[in-house]
Amino acid sequence: MNLKPPTSKVELRIKCHKILDKDTLSKSDPRASVYEKDRAGQFRLIGKTETIQNQLNPEFKTPIVIDYRFEEIQVLKFEIHDVDKNDEDFIGDASCTLTSILSKPGQTVCLQLLTKSGKHAGSMTVIAEEIKNTLQTIKFNLIGKKFDKKDLFGAGCDPYLIISRKVPSTNTFVKIYESQVQKGTLNPVFSGIEMKLEELCGGDMQREIKFEFYDWDRIGKHDYIGEFHTNAQELLQPNQAFNVINSHKQEKKSGYKNSGTVSVSDAVIEREYNFLEYIMGGCQMNLIVGIDCTASNGDSNDPNSLHYKNAQGLNQYANAICSVGNVIVPYTTTPLIPVYGFGGIMPGQSEVSHCFPMTLNASNTLCCGVNGVLDCYYDNISKIQLHGPTYFAPLINMAARYASQGQSQSNQKYTILMIITDGEILDADNTIDAIVKSSGLPLSIIIVGVGNANFTNMNILDGDDAALQSGGVRAERDIVQFVAMRDYLNRPNELAAEVLREIPTQFLSFMKKYKFRPNPPPPPPPVIIGAPPQYDNPTTTTTATSPSTGIDLNKGSNVGLNLTKTESSPSPSGGAGIDLNKGSVVDITKGVSNVSLEKN
């Protein structure tokens, strides 16, 4: 049964007090995770906050957004973990209903955190607020001058900024933003501050906002410099400047003026577009599938193999192909899907290849629809000599060449590479380098882990906690999502939802960076008088064939197209250069020149 649209969206902000210290030589590095109980009684992850270093009283700036449904009892579980580089230690958890938060004065609850043995592990305060979505983003810069000197040595100050907004019902403030530290300056510049208008002020232009400035210290408590209060409407006024006031100094010194000044520059509100607007405007989504052909999967003829074709149901590879493919393919203008293998030896070859066509035909990498991908996989996996090792970089570089073709305002495309694998990668450095270099392209990478292997390194590739770096260069955007199939066995809909959860955010980050706007929705096709009706869910089977190739588009089959290089015009298929009237496509593995994406 489909869920009703949410009554509204609610933002949860979390802070903790005196949590257990799990670290021996320092303090815990806490992170909060929030889960909601689904209709099957299982807790489903809604979101995570950032990790705060060395803090037993963390106030998380990352909000957790949840759909509020009036007609349901929504049970929430809050977990706090101490997050180290390669491990997470459970600190404590607490549960309550969303209604219990919303019905409290100030929409605020205080919960006791408990360990797994039921012992006290600290406390947690949760504040809820309804989100009024205006689809607007506010941007501004802050320029500080003559801040108070706080350090005896050096330049005298290492300032950073905290922005908080007022909660009217409780007359308190919640932290929404924290800047990087500006090292060694009394004249800090906080540039490129950007957030949704709802996040800054809840959509209320008169909502009070607090700007606090602190001097960062390596050891001990950070020193308070001062603060000023304003609202979004004032921020947008030209030539705004504020005194940074330290109330303690103001009370003690009769001639006190300020602890510095801050002026506002380039404050603007920009319209924010949503994912659906781009899709409705004709943006082409493309899927590329990569299949692990390493020996660790087991001989495909062995019933214990991950590649075994089981008459009783789909194996995990086929399950991933169907779950994700059936969601993405409806957004494509053609059903053609490139499919590649890696870590195997093709028939007639002696060398391992880390990016080869699963069709086993170098001039034809395309399959028609999800069924065509399945047919190709089942027909050819037994013909490939499973080998190894597991390398991702060649496959990612191929997808990057594919994604780099023909992007423009009028011809928008976005590529999703789905890699299905059973084990750890052995070219981590090269893979990270390929991901970093691809992070500026219209590309997302989904990694689905099958089987019971240790997938620790995969979580490193998923840059949720920290941006990937290679050779001193940071990734422009997070483009990787990893999901372990074993967590979603027999739940294909939930698998697809989790695998694709980050795609809209990754998609929008690219479009926003390069200032691509949604195109107007194309007009509906003309109605031809006397023509038979066209259904999106036909109940009878008809045979549709391509006029040039004779392909039965209702059957899962490989597309018999020749590959030739075309330079004249980009194609609606997202870089494959497909001309269905001529039956030719670009060979995306050879000689493709990159397109420079310039910010307009």
From Swiss-Prot:
Biased composition (Polar residues): 555-572
Positions of Ca(2+) 3 binding: D151, D158, D215, D217
Sequence positions that bind Ca(2+) 4: D151, D215, D217, D223
Disordered as annotated region, ranges: 535-583
Biological process terms in GO annotation: cellular response to calcium ion; contractile vacuole discharge; contractile vacuole organization; culmination involved in sorocarp development; hypotonic response; mitotic cytokinesis; negative regulation of exocytosis; positive phototaxis
Protein's recorded name: Copine-A
Keywords attached to this entry: Calcium, Cytoplasm, Membrane, Metal-binding, Repeat
Lineage, uppermost ranks: Eukaryota, Amoebozoa, Evosea, Eumycetozoa, Dictyostelia
Function per UniProt: Required for cytokinesis, contractile vacuole function and development.
Source organism: Dictyostelium discoideum
Cofactor requirement: Ca(2+)
Gene inactivation effect: Cells exhibit normal growth rates and a slight cytokinesis defect. When placed in starvation conditions these cells appear to aggregate into mounds and form fingers with normal timing; however, they are delayed or arrested in the finger stage. When placed in water the cells forme unusually large contractile vacuoles, indicating a defect in contractile vacuole function.
